[in-house]
């Protein structure tokens, strides 16, 4: 199975998480600023990741990445999403960027895999929650970094 992990990162935390995920999936790791439309299309499983900045914004390189997604043929493509957020300082927009990626890929007909439970997190609102579950893996490297390895491992077993 061919897997591409495409991520955006400024501080390096999302890049580090993407690297761990890619290593466990034996995947090709791609920074979104270097991605092409083919990178989104030419794989069996597409994994996308972004931190949430400010009041729910995608990482800035994803602005162009979302445009590439709009050009890509994703109908029926299995897509898994992961995101980083800070539930303590941003409880009103916790991991919202994940919801934006979800909207972008589902609009293109992608099949989302890897929904996760919201239990164990404390936040007020998140655009990453649909039907009572997160649309992908959510990591809080600010307040719950010690839980990330277990969360990644559990999520990976779910998306394979």
Segment roles from a protein language model:
Residues 1-2, 43:
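Secondary-structure boundary/capping motif
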Residues 2-24:
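N-terminal beta1-alpha1 ligand-phosphate binding loop
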Residues 16, 24, 28, 42-160:
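FMN-binding flavodoxin-like domain, especially the glycine-rich phosphate-binding loop
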Residues 27-37:
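A short beta-strand-loop structural module common to alpha/beta enzyme folds
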């Amino acid at each position: 199975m061919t897997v591409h992990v495409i991520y955006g990162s400024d501080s390096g935390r999302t890049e580090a998480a993407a690297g761990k995920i890619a290593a466990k999936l034996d995947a090709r790791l791609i920074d979104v600023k270097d991605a092409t439309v083919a990178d989104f299309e030419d794989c069996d499983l597409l994994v996308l990741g972004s931190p949430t900045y400010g009041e729910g914004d995608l990482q800035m390189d994803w602005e162009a990445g979302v445009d590439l997604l709009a050009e890509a043929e994703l109908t029926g493509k299995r897509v898994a999403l992961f995101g980083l957020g800070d539930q303590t300082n941003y409880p009103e927009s916790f991991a919202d960027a994940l919801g934006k990626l979800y909207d972008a890929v589902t609009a293109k007909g992608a099949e989302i895999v890897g929904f996760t439970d919201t239990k164990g997190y404390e936040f007020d609102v998140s655009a990453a929650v649909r039907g009572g579950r997160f649309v992908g893996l959510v990591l809080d490297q600010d307040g719950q970094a010690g839980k990330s390895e277990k969360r990644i491992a559990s999520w990976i077993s779910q998306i394979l």
